[in-house]
Amino acid sequence: MGSFSIWHWLIVLVIVMLVFGTKKLRNIGQDLGGAVKGFKDGMKEGDDKAAPAKELRDSTTIDVDAKEKTRQQ
């Protein structure tokens, strides 16, 4: 009673297809696939944009002590 057999899942699938129809299920699948693809692309773009910003911060370090020494003179 704890797990469902393949027959239970087939019956559920048939009922869902009768209630929603195949066209609506296809549209839901396409929307879900597009959302997953957009999420993956966004994650890839986020990683690419973060890497150059980190390199930029490392290369533009300002020596604060040097500015204070020149002001005192």
UniProtKB/Swiss-Prot annotation:
It is a single-pass membrane protein. The chain crosses the membrane at residues 1-21. It comes from the Bacteria. One of its GO terms (cellular component) is TAT protein transport complex. Keywords: Cell inner membrane, Cell membrane, Membrane, Protein transport, Translocation, Transmembrane, Transmembrane helix, Transport. GO terms for biological process: protein transport by the Tat complex. It is found in: Cell inner membrane. GO terms for molecular function: protein transmembrane transporter activity. InterPro entries: TatA/B/E, TatA/E. Residues 43-73 are annotated as: Disordered. The keyword Hydrolase does not apply. The keyword Transmembrane helix applies. The Tat system comprises two distinct complexes: a TatABC complex, containing multiple copies of TatA, TatB and TatC subunits, and a separate TatA complex, containing only TatA subunits. Substrates initially bind to the TatABC complex, which probably triggers association of the separate TatA complex to form the active translocon. Part of the twin-arginine translocation (Tat) system that transports large folded proteins containing a characteristic twin-arginine motif in their signal peptide across membranes. TatA could form the protein-conducting channel of the Tat system. Belongs to the TatA/E family. This is Sec-independent protein translocase protein TatA. It comes from Cupriavidus pinatubonensis (strain JMP 134 / LMG 1197) (Cupriavidus necator (strain JMP 134)). The gene is tatA.
